[in-house]
Amino acid sequence: MKKLWAGRFLEASSELLERFNASLPFDKALYFEDIKGSKAHAKMLAKQEIITAKECEEILAGLEKVLGEIERGEFVFKIADEDIHMAIEARLTELIGASGKKLHTARSRNDQVAVDFRMFVLRKNEEIRAQILELMETILEIASKHISTLMPGMTHLQHAQPVSFGFHMNAYACMFKRDVERLEDSHKRHNYCPLGSAALAGTPYPTDREFLAKELGFLAPTLNAMDSVSDRDFALDLLYDIAMVMMHISRLAEEMVLWSSYEFKFITLSDAYSTGSSIMPQKKNPDVPELLRGKSGRVYGNLLSLLTVMKGLPLAYNKDTQEDKEGVMDSVETAQISLAILKEALKSATINAKAMEEACKRGHLTATDLADFLVRSCEVPFREAHHITGQVVAYAESKGKDISELSEAEILGIDSRIKAGVKEVLSLKNSMNARNSLGGTSSAQTKAQIKTLHTWLKKRLK
């Protein structure tokens, strides 16, 4: 089949070139955006009297037929068409004849793919944001049920201070909140229309780029045609934003793997989101969080891959940028299925509050409270209080106890400067609720955080 651009060529393209050069196997995913952009372009051409109203009507009707064929699975994608733009234009011309050949007036594939891909990226940005908001709802629902559920807060994966499970889950809600805000920022930054930039320097036709931007739902046209056709910042920003989302998912997934182990037993994953072993019949494996953890690596790779593609490209458009789409599409698909399955795995998991609270009785979680008591109530300098507390911990370990399990008499006998009332500050519940500073783990602060996060969510779920 003769190429639409083959006028100056004396030889046909080799079959090997067609296979190597074609992007149709993956950019056919842009069919909706391509047809949407072409409809807007046709309307603009008619408005500016570059084509007739009748020709515009024929083009719009033909594009609607092409859209129907694709969505019904009737459209025949031919590798010789190279890309989705040529495939749609070729079929349009088959359907409506000469009018179809006028659609590409005042347009290049350079600005055509720029607007198609940008619209795709912005749409996926919105979809991913919506999924994160749903995940946050699930996380906050869990947090609301466990405002007072004690668990060991950790640093260096060692027991540190008692916190509530609700407080711990709020931390993840805050991470995903930032992800949404990051995606919102990216969407706003890239919501500008490159269509009308043509190949690289604009067009001599009397086009109306403001009309195109409005018709396609953008804030305004882009400023510089050369930048417009060579820019892939919008794709890189989405890749980075997704990488951050997956990093946060991976951190939560890592904890789910730990929490579901026999050593922790903090949560039990449902059978629907667990797998078994081919040889060990007793096994119940946390494959979902393990895969979530592993999939973060592939989205990091997609980001680095496109950064590497873009780093040495001279202005303006280069064929190298054809390599932008597969990585973005893979990262989008990875993020969307990851967000969906994480939400369901969390919703269906059983929280073992008793195991969490029992774990708080190991690791001397209230040692800091004892040191603070010595400073505030016993007027002991902090460094000495730190030393005395270490002696109490050593005594408790010699007795095979946690410091929260020591009697007041035992503690008073370790150092004469320790005053009566010390036992009360070693209570795990009291320790948790004593941390009532803004952002702290007390029940009051955890409730306040949930309320703030819910208010933020409601503004975006309208």
Curated annotation (Swiss-Prot):
Q: Name one GO cellular component term.
A: cytosol
Q: Name one GO biological process term.
A: arginine biosynthetic process via ornithine
Gene Ontology MF terms in the entry: argininosuccinate lyase activity
User: SUPFAM superfamilies under this entry?
Assistant: L-aspartase-like
From the UniProt record, give the pathway where this protein acts: Amino-acid biosynthesis; L-arginine biosynthesis; L-arginine from L-ornithine and carbamoyl phosphate: step 3/3
Q: Which NCBIfam families match?
A: argH
Q: What is this protein called?
A: Argininosuccinate lyase
Recorded source organism is Wolinella succinogenes (strain ATCC 29543 / DSM 1740 / CCUG 13145 / JCM 31913 / LMG 7466 / NCTC 11488 / FDC 602W) (Vibrio succinogenes)
What gene name is given for the protein in this entry?
argH
